[in-house]
């Protein structure tokens, strides 16, 4: 463990452990796994991002600056793909944009993407937009122009095409436990008494019957978006890993 990482961990360790164990009273082992994973992601973080981290440690409210001018966009609508967006950075700079918020760009199934919010793979860019290498190159160029990069990180649910969902459908209990599965409608009916509907017209109800596994699964958005079960510490840890992987590509802000 480096001195820098140890200093940061010690500063937040007690609060982090307390909060984690409040969520997961029997999760000491999972907490240790989380800490080990965070250290590994720190080790893999490149020197440029580490230098930026140090700078921002000294200016903790950097993201609140009145000098930040943001722009939110869908990559394909603005520039076709990530490479095209990179070519338009000079134009954005001329407009004084220094905070670039990218709408969802991760891999989603065709026809069931919900505008990019039905993620099938958190470590793969939608092929029509480019590759993860393209994203890393874009972030490098953004930072060369003092432009911060933000992304939408969809953490409430995954696509039914996600590996976890596929393995859950195949009957693997470990993966069913990462979602909300029910053998009958008894418990879902209780949820429905108080749980509001996100899309009452286009996708009414919060549960979907899956004939392929003879179970109900919680789907508060669309039937192809399965809610993640954060009562399971494995879900929390794995999603943190996904987030830190993306942050190490040069993402500054996660929404």
Regions found by a protein language model. Name each.
Residues 1-232, 236-240, 244, 248:
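Acidic/aromatic-lined carbohydrate-recognition and catalytic surfaces
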């Amino acid at each position: 463990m480096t001195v820098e990482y140890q200093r940061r961990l010690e500063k937040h360790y007690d609060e982090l452990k307390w909060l984690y164990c409040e969520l997961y009273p029997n999760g000491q082992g999972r907490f240790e796994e989380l800490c080990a994973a965070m250290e590994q992601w720190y080790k893999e973080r490149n020197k440029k991002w580490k230098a930026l981290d140090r700078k921002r440690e000294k200016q903790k409210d950097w993201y609140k600056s009145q000098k930040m001018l943001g722009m939110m966009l869908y990559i394909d609508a603005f520039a076709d793909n990530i490479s095209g967006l990179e070519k338009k950075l000079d134009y954005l700079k001329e407009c004084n944009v220094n905070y670039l918020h990218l709408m969802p760009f991760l891999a989603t199934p065709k026809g069931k993407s919900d505008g990019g919010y039905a993620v099938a793979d958190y470590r793969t860019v939608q092929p029509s937009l480019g590759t993860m290498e393209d994203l890393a190159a874009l972030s490098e160029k953004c930072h060369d122009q003092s432009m911060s990069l933000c992304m939408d990180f969809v953490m409430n649910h995954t696509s039914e095409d996600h590996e976890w969902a596929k393995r859950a459908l195949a009957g693997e209990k470990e993966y069913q436990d990462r979602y909300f599965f029910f053998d009958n409608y008894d418990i879902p009916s209780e949820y429905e008494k108080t749980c509001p509907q996100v899309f009452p017209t286009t996708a009414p109800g919060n549960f979907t019957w899956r004939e392929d596994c003879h179970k109900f699964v919680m789907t508060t958005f669309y039937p192809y978006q399965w809610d993640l079960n954060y009562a399971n510490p494995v879900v929390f840890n794995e999603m943190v890993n996904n987030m830190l992987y993306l942050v190490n590509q040069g993402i500054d802000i996660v929404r």
